[in-house]
């Protein structure tokens, strides 16, 4: 996808070199973006999708009812997502605080968040089939620099990619679904362009 976009840009004498992009939390997209656009690229995860990930895990762990009925549990989940608003240099302080007030039943959710978004996992590995086991820390799949919105908020930038999601929603409505024929797509785009020009 990124290569296709760059090719179209180059055909139109445009040579983008973005400094950052905002994406959902999909490792394949992040890897592709860095591979095509360069390692210098700063990846910002969408805050909405971070919260959605927490709530998906909540459901997966069978904690939805507890979330709806237990005020303290609900508040803890909000604070978990709220870690994204802390300055990066105070994040560990926030994680440590949440660890100290974790309500009963939230342990697995907290562990998921910490391993996926904060500190990663610790695994035992067996090097070269020996009897010697080594313990190694693997980094978080999405490190805090990816999902932290503190500076983004201070800079008055978007914390989510809702603008894109909204456009995509509108576009799907415009073309009558998610998989229109190429002819329907061309006709609808032409109609949209004519409507814009008429304004």
Give the positions of each predicted feature.
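Inter-domain linker/hinge segments that demarcate the starts of reverse transcriptase
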Residues: 1-6
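Extended amphipathic alpha-helical interaction segments
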Residues: 7-198
